[in-house]
Amino acid sequence: MPKLGMQPIRRRQLIDATLDAINEVGMHDATIAQIARRAGVSTGIISHYFKDKNGLLEATMRDITSQLRDAVLNRLHALPDGSASQRLQAIVGGNFDETQISSAAMKAWLAFWASSMHQPMLYRLQQVSSRRLLSNLVYEFRRELPREQAQEAGYGLAALIDGLWLRAALSGKPLDKTLAQSLTSHFIRQHLPNP
């Protein structure tokens, strides 16, 4: 019989072990046995909590997307009366939070995006994450721009965020936060009438 209160601890162990395995060998080569070994548990524990590898991968991506949401919301909540420019920079900062730009997180995101084209549940998670980013950006641009311009600016800033992130992920080098901040700030200033 499982010990009370162990589920959150075990789930965290397994998600962390999954990220480690993806970081080291990639999503497709990360086996249940490798993940269980890294977590110090039997493969049966993975089946118990997640049913199979896909369930574990989905839980891992839910965890990463939850960390992204929290990183953005924490920054926005710190600026309740902030200008559109400040709040847009907060959204950018959340997307470049340490939880999102570690080697393990970046590799997991890349694998997640690739797998989402073939797995409906991962596709749904990817769409939710993508829509959330665009919605947040458009909402802030909309404070100072007409709807169509706000949508265009939001789409452009989302593409810039994704592009900077993707270039860093594929380079194998850490994201240059100073450069990312400079480029996104410039984009925001170009699109807001009163930055």
From Swiss-Prot:
InterPro entries associated with the record: BetI_C (IPR039538), DNA-bd_HTH_TetR-type_CS (IPR023772), Homeodomain-like_sf (IPR009057), HTH-type_TetR-like_transc_reg (IPR050109), HTH_TetR (IPR001647), Tet_transcr_reg_TetR-rel_C_sf (IPR036271), Tscrpt_rep_BetI (IPR017757)
GO biological process, any: glycine betaine biosynthetic process from choline
Residue stretches making up the HTH tetR-type domain: 8-68
MF terms in GO: DNA-binding transcription factor activity; transcription cis-regulatory region binding
Record function comment: Repressor involved in the biosynthesis of the osmoprotectant glycine betaine. It represses transcription of the choline transporter BetT and the genes of BetAB involved in the synthesis of glycine betaine.
Protein name per the record: HTH-type transcriptional regulator BetI
Key words, A-Z: DNA-binding, Repressor, Transcription, Transcription regulation
Organism: Klebsiella pneumoniae (strain 342)
Chain's gene name: betI
